[in-house]
Amino acid sequence: MENMFRLMDQDQDLTNNRCIWVNGPVIVGAGPSGLATAACLHEQNVPFVVLERADCIASLWQKRTYDRLKLHLPKQFCQLPKMPFPEDFPEYPTKRQFIDYLESYATRFEINPKFNECVQTARFDETSGLWRVKTVSKSESTQTEVEYICRWLVVATGENAERVMPEIDGLSEFSGEVIHACDYKSGEKFAGKKVLVVGCGNSGMEVSLDLANHFAKPSMVVRSSLHVMPREVMGKSTFELAMKMLRWFPLWLVDKILLVLSWMVLGNIEKYGLKRPEMGPMELKSVKGKTPVLDIGAIEKIRLGKINVVPGIKRFNGNKVELVNGEQLDVDSVVLATGYRSNVPYWLQENEFFAKNGFPKTVADNNGWKGRTGLYAVGFTRKGLSGASMDAVKIAQDIGSVWQLETKQPTKRSRGSLRRCISQQF
């Protein structure tokens, strides 16, 4: 509290605004990463506040994913800390099952985010040694500005906070429908239409597959090399198999084995216009964070001619698209499966821990979860949900050790006496 009074002395305007002192960390983001961190803090008896700009938890999953989506990895690699998936869930839970799991998770660990609070800025105040997090919350008729003052700030907005919209010559004048993959729900409304899917990652492949299954005519733009792996080999998860092999074999050998297995299951995909990178799939993931595509049926559709693979785009002209090889295609609709990016640079006023791309600078050193001055990041290590869970455990232990020492509380305490958040309004 001494720091709080020092902050008030040097900024008299605080008394004229709604200001909340948080007796614990502020977590920005109520997706899986933020929920995992909150749950681990709960187990450490550390109070917290979770700020979420949307009106629900896991808004990316609830509002910006397609209907057919399932987890790409087996559920044991996607569960959050302290709570496994229900035993009756399939190995690859559906979108709806994963959302149900997250909602149950939030209930179990008493996580009640402050919804519709969009963080405008967050900066560390050197004088007080505290973080100042300014938010704007909007209702139907009012707009409220709040400033949260805290000792610790956990950035949990993740790798996929904002859609990436490519700049393509003539796209703005295209006469058909253009949507980002985050607005795509089902191929049902595209039946019989010629749809150009821009992007060939997991989203691009699955959107193309879904379109083909709904009798659309998808063409998928593939500009660069990529690794496509079967999701399973002989009934076993390819990812799980890779993780087991890495315990015993060097990475280069694991990559060679995976490529042989992929060729055995999928055949030579390069003859369909899908060129593989020189770097192996696991090495590419480790070095550049580029995730291999896990095939769930798209390659078979490509082989049958149900999905057309095309090279890069040169320009749009009316309802036509000209490709870099000179070919022209008639197109009714365009789906931009061009990915997402971090939005951290837009609101976090800090450039020592985070780089301009919105990722921690120290990710490659396996220390991308902790910065200075009480700043933490969860879910930025490009290791999926399992990586976010590992970050969450480390962050909670780091903050919890300081909290327990300073408050001299026992590690465990009855749930009934646990205080989620101690706040004072000024």
Curated annotation (Swiss-Prot):
GO BP annotations listed: auxin biosynthetic process; brassinosteroid mediated signaling pathway; regulation of auxin biosynthetic process; response to cytokinin; response to ethylene
Write down the SUPFAM superfamilies for this protein, in alphabetical order: FAD/NAD(P)-binding domain
Q: What EC number(s) does its UniProt record assign? A: 1.14.13.168
Name the residues that bind NADP(+).
199-204
> Matching InterPro entries, A to Z?
Auxin_biosynth/cation_transpt, FAD/NAD-bd_sf, Flavin_mOase-like
User: Does this entry carry the keyword Oxidoreductase?
Assistant: yes
Which reaction(s) does its UniProt entry say it catalyses? indole-3-pyruvate + NADPH + O2 + H(+) = (indol-3-yl)acetate + CO2 + NADP(+) + H2O
| Induction behaviour | Up-regulated by high temperature via activation by PIF4. Positively regulated by STY1 and during the day by REV1.
This protein's pathway reads: Plant hormone metabolism; auxin biosynthesis
Tissue and organ expression note? Expressed in root tips and in hydathodes. Expressed in root vasculature and quiescent center, but not in the meristematic zone of the root tip.
Q: Give the superkingdom in one word.
A: Eukaryota
Residues bound to FAD: 29-34
What Pfam families does the record point to? FMO-like (PF00743)
Cofactor(s) needed by this chain: FAD
Q: Which UniProt keywords apply?
A: Auxin biosynthesis, FAD, Flavoprotein, Monooxygenase, NADP, Oxidoreductase
A molecular function (GO) held by this record is:
flavin adenine dinucleotide binding
Family listed: Belongs to the FMO family.
Name the job this protein performs. Involved in auxin biosynthesis. Belongs to the set of redundant YUCCA genes probably responsible for auxin biosynthesis in roots.
The name this protein goes by in its record: Probable indole-3-pyruvate monooxygenase YUCCA8
Native source organism of the sequence: Arabidopsis thaliana (Mouse-ear cress)
Q: Which gene holds the coding sequence for this protein?
A: YUC8
